[in-house]
């Protein structure tokens, strides 16, 4: 088994976990590419990405170009003479000159079973859509978005209580071992490249804060999936009014679907220790864990202890 000289390109914690797995393997990371430092926190101080922090701890050269389209950046990368480039949630488009620079091309770790969800948010969209199974795909990159030949797929179930946080952690563990397996066998015939069927693909669009607002004209089953898909970001929310008529926005962390009641969508049906029940166009959404502004997430019962007037039975929420 040959040790490979690898360029690693990635930015968030999900990527850093893959970098650590390669560092723990027999392969050599000769350079790391990551997004430029970005302002973060209240002081808006420049903050290095998790991948950069890990690279610096291991004395690996770090490159942070704003783009890889310029010839200078491409020449710099090519001069590294890498065997392969591993790309995990990097955040920059790789032009053909970069894809062709490493001897064995560029590999990408994708957080779903392709071609089902191509794009930026495959983990979240798989929950949002009600998929019961997902996984990770290691693919050979080409010039289009998530369309390259698939080398290795590893499957896992999506549990009925799965959030994007829990699924992300599960997939990270699967993906790191799958990646090392591919790298260890890249120059033998263990993994045969498989073409994608583009007709089976969907675009996993980025989540937005606007989309996280609970829309009572949607079925309760869809809203419950949204709550899990949008955790840890942007967190599903809705608004009600206090006794003075002031709008109060609440984030929702946990809910369950109950049988349909014949009331207009958005009607508060009950509010007690068992939850806050809201009628939807199809089914009832029972809110179990919520977070008012400036407070920590709490049970519906704890929320009602001081704010019962926010949830008058029969009130119709917008």
From Swiss-Prot:
- Give GO cellular component annotations, separated by semicolons: cytosol
| Class of enzymatic activity (EC top level) | transferase
* Record-listed (6S)-5,6,7,8-tetrahydrofolate binding positions: 112-115
Protein EC: 2.1.2.9
Q: Which UniProt keywords apply?
A: Protein biosynthesis, Transferase
Q: What CDD domains does the record tag this protein with? A: FMT_core_Met-tRNA-FMT_N, Met_tRNA_FMT_C
Q: Which InterPro entries match?
A: Fmt, Formyl_trans_C, Formyl_trans_C_sf, Formyl_transf_N, Formyl_transf_N_sf, Formyl_transferase-like_C_sf, GART_AS, Met-tRNA-FMT_C
Signal peptide interval: none
A GO molecular-function annotation: methionyl-tRNA formyltransferase activity
Query: Is Transferase tagged as a keyword?
Result: yes
Its recorded reaction(s) are:
L-methionyl-tRNA(fMet) + (6R)-10-formyltetrahydrofolate = N-formyl-L-methionyl-tRNA(fMet) + (6S)-5,6,7,8-tetrahydrofolate + H(+)
According to its UniProt entry, the function of this protein is described as: Attaches a formyl group to the free amino group of methionyl-tRNA(fMet). The formyl group appears to play a dual role in the initiator identity of N-formylmethionyl-tRNA by promoting its recognition by IF2 and preventing the misappropriation of this tRNA by the elongation apparatus.
Q: Which PANTHER family match?
A: METHIONYL-TRNA FORMYLTRANSFERASE (PTHR11138), METHIONYL-TRNA FORMYLTRANSFERASE, MITOCHONDRIAL (PTHR11138:SF5)
Similarity annotation: Belongs to the Fmt family.
What HAMAP family does the record tag this protein with? Formyl_trans (MF_00182)
Q: What is this protein called?
A: Methionyl-tRNA formyltransferase
Q: Which organism is it from?
A: Haemophilus influenzae (strain PittGG)
The uppermost taxa in this organism's lineage are: Bacteria, Pseudomonadati, Pseudomonadota, Gammaproteobacteria, Pasteurellales
């Amino acid at each position: 088994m040959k040790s490979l000289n690898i360029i690693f390109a990635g930015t968030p914690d999900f990527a850093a976990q893959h970098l650590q797995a390669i560092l723990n393997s027999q392969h050599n990371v000769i350079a790391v590419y990551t997004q430029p430092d970005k302002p973060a926190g209240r002081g808006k101080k420049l903050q290095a990405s998790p991948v950069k922090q890990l690279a610096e701890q291991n004395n690996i050269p770090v490159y942070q170009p704003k783009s890889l389209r310029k010839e200078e950046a491409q020449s710099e990368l090519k001069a590294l003479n890498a065997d392969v480039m591993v790309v995990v949630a990097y955040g920059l488009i790789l032009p053909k000159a970069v894809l062709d620079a490493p001897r064995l091309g560029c590999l990408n770790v994708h957080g779903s079973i392709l071609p089902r969800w191509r794009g930026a948010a495959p983990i979240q969209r798989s929950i949002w859509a009600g998929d019961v199974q997902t996984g990770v795909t290691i693919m050979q990159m080409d010039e289009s978005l998530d369309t390259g030949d698939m080398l290795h797929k590893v499957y896992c179930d999506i549990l009925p209580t799965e959030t994007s946080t829990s699924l992300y952690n599960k997939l990270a563990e699967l993906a790191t071992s799958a990646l090392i397996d591919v790298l260890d066998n890249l120059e033998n015939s263990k993994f045969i490249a498989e073409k994608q069927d583009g007709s089976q693909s969907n675009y996993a669009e980025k989540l937005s804060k606007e989309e996280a607002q609970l829309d009572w004209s949607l079925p309760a089953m869809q809203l419950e999936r949204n709550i899990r898909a949008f955790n840890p970001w942007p967190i599903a929310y809705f608004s009600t009014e206090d006794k003075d008529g002031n709008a109060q926005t609440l984030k929702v962390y946990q809910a369950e679907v109950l049988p349909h009641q014949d009331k207009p969508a958005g009607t508060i049906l009950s509010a007690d220790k068992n939850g806050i029940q809201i009628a939807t166009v199809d089914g009832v959404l029972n809110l179990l864990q919520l977070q008012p502004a400036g407070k920590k997430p709490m049970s519906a019962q704890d929320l009602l202890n001081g704010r019962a007037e926010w949830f008058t039975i029969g009130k119709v929420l917008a």
